[in-house]
Amino acid sequence: MNIELIVQLTSLALITLAGPLIVALLFLKQGNL
């Protein structure tokens, strides 16, 4: 298996998982304000 392919897949997975988390954090920050 290519290491570059694994890195790309892991980065995409992290982005897809971190996306909603970042949105939730921004939502909470706006709610606190």
Curated annotation (Swiss-Prot):
Location comes to: Plastid, Chloroplast thylakoid membrane
Membrane topology, as annotated, equals: Single-pass membrane protein
HAMAP family per the record? Answer: PSII_Psb30_Ycf12 (MF_01329)
What name does this protein carry? Answer: Photosystem II reaction center protein Psb30
User: Coiled-coil regions in this chain?
Assistant: none
> Which parts pass through the membrane?
5-25
Q: Give the family per the record.
A: Belongs to the Psb30/Ycf12 family.
To which species is this protein native? Euglena sanguinea
Matching Pfam families: PSII_Ycf12
Q: What does this protein do?
A: A core subunit of photosystem II (PSII), probably helps stabilize the reaction center.
Keywords (A to Z) from UniProt: Chloroplast, Membrane, Photosynthesis, Photosystem II, Plastid, Thylakoid, Transmembrane, Transmembrane helix
Stored InterPro entries: PSII_Ycf12_core-subunit (IPR010284)
**Source domain of life:** Eukaryota
Q: What GO biological process terms are annotated to this protein in UniProt?
A: photosynthesis
Instruction: Give the record's subunit note.
Output: PSII is composed of 1 copy each of membrane proteins PsbA, PsbB, PsbC, PsbD, PsbE, PsbF, PsbH, PsbI, PsbJ, PsbK, PsbL, PsbM, PsbT, PsbY, PsbZ, Psb30/Ycf12, peripheral proteins of the oxygen-evolving complex and a large number of cofactors. It forms dimeric complexes.
What's in the GO CC field? Answer: chloroplast thylakoid membrane; photosystem II
